[in-house]
Amino acid sequence: MNYVAQVLSNSFSVKDTKLVKRLLGSAGFYVDEWNDNGKECLCFYDNEDSAYLCDMNLVYYNGIPIVVTADYNDDEDIYQAIEEYAKVKEEDIDEDLIETQDFFIFLQTQLLDGEAVQVTEVGHEGLRYQSGCGVAITKNKYQWFDLKREMQKFVDENV
C-alpha cells in the first residue's frame, strides 16, 4: 500500500493571486479564492494527486515560473509543461534555461505584508504508521514542523 496524505493550508493573501493559483493547480492542489472586504484571499488543499509538501519545487523556464512539481514526478511532466509554454511563445526549448527553486521560497516572495501561510500534511501508509508535518511561512522565514518530533520534544521537556 502506498503513502496517502491530505494537505490543507490556512487562508492567505499574495501579490499575484492568479500566478500562485495557477502554480498550485499545476502541483495538483485545489485552490479556493474569495474576496474578504476588498482583500483577495486563497487557500489550497489536496486532491489526492498533489505533490507532497517536502518535494515541492518550482520549475522556471527562461526566468518565468512554469510549473510546480515534486522530485518523484517523472521528468516528462516538467518537459511537457515547458513544451506547452514554449509552443505558446513560439520558441524552441533550450534546456540550459530550465531552473528549479524550492516552492516555499518563491511563496515567501509573494506574501503580502503581515501575511503567513500554514500548511499541514497528515498521512499514513495502510495505517502501519501515521505522519504529520507542516510548514509555516512568513515573508522573513519559513520553518518545517514534524508532529512526532514536536511531541517528543514536549515529553522530554516535561517529564
What are these regions (language model features)?
Residues M1-D32:
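Short, extreme N-terminal segment that most often corresponds to the first beta-strand
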Residues D36-V159:
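Charged interaction segments
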